[in-house]
From Swiss-Prot:
This is ATP synthase subunit b 1. One of its GO terms (cellular component) is plasma membrane. Its main location: membrane. The gene is atpF1. The keyword Transcription regulation does not apply. It comes from Beijerinckia indica subsp. indica (strain ATCC 9039 / DSM 1715 / NCIMB 8712). F(1)F(0) ATP synthase produces ATP from ADP in the presence of a proton or sodium gradient. F-type ATPases consist of two structural domains, F(1) containing the extramembraneous catalytic core and F(0) containing the membrane proton channel, linked together by a central stalk and a peripheral stalk. During catalysis, ATP synthesis in the catalytic domain of F(1) is coupled via a rotary mechanism of the central stalk subunits to proton translocation. CDD domains: ATP-synt_Fo_b. Keywords: ATP synthesis, Cell inner membrane, Cell membrane, CF(0), Hydrogen ion transport, Ion transport, Membrane, Transmembrane, Transmembrane helix, Transport. It holds the Pfam family ATP-synt_B. The keyword Membrane applies. F-type ATPases have 2 components, F(1) - the catalytic core - and F(0) - the membrane proton channel. F(1) has five subunits: alpha(3), beta(3), gamma(1), delta(1), epsilon(1). F(0) has three main subunits: a(1), b(2) and c(10-14). The alpha and beta chains form an alternating ring which encloses part of the gamma chain. F(1) is attached to F(0) by a central stalk formed by the gamma and epsilon chains, while a peripheral stalk is formed by the delta and b chains. It comes from the Bacteria.
Length: 161
């Protein structure tokens, strides 16, 4: 019987497999593969948990974001309302200030007019007095003037008694 190299390779392979089976390498391989499969399952379960936690965090952050946006909108609305109230109050104060200034100016103008009228009346009275003095001085010269003086003295005596 002649054996060729293929026979020896096949015989070596069968012996090799028999040795592996004798030492239980297949059990160790199965155990290693099972261990690897369990670790992969754990990793997948952990990944699923992480994904769920991430989804929960995302939902929480989106809720917080919505709350923050609503709060920001409320703050903006409140600030806008306060700004409008401040502007309205400033406008009212300005209107009151303008009204007071206008009233003060009108009062000053009225006082100036009254003072000017008083000065004009005083000047007119002085002018009338001077004119009357000049007229009376011219008219009171001589006997007529003496007669007026006597009448004035008699009037004073009568008023005194």
């Amino acid at each position: 019987m002649e054996f060729n190299e293929e026979f020896y390779v096949a015989l070596g392979f069968v012996i090799f497999v028999a040795i592996l089976l004798y030492y239980g390498v297949h059990n160790k391989l199965n155990a290693a593969l099972d261990k690897r499969a369990d670790r992969i399952r754990e990793d997948l379960a952990h990944a699923v948990r992480l994904r769920e936690e991430a989804a929960a965090l995302l939902a929480s952050f989106e809720k917080r974001k919505a709350e923050a946006e609503a709060e920001a909108e409320a703050l903006v609305a409140q600030a806008r309302t306060e700004a409008e109230m401040i502007a309205k109050e400033a406008h009212e104060r300005l209107a009151e200030f303008v009204q007071r200034r206008t009233q003060q100016a009108e009062n000053k103008i009225a006082n100036a007019e009254a003072q000017a009228m008083a000065e004009v009346k005083a000047i007119a009275a002085d002018a009338a007095t001077k004119a009357a003095e000049i007229l009376l001085t011219d008219a009171a010269k001589g006997a007529y003037g003496q007669k007026l003086i006597d009448q004035g003295i008699d009037g004073l005596k009568a008023a005194a008694h």
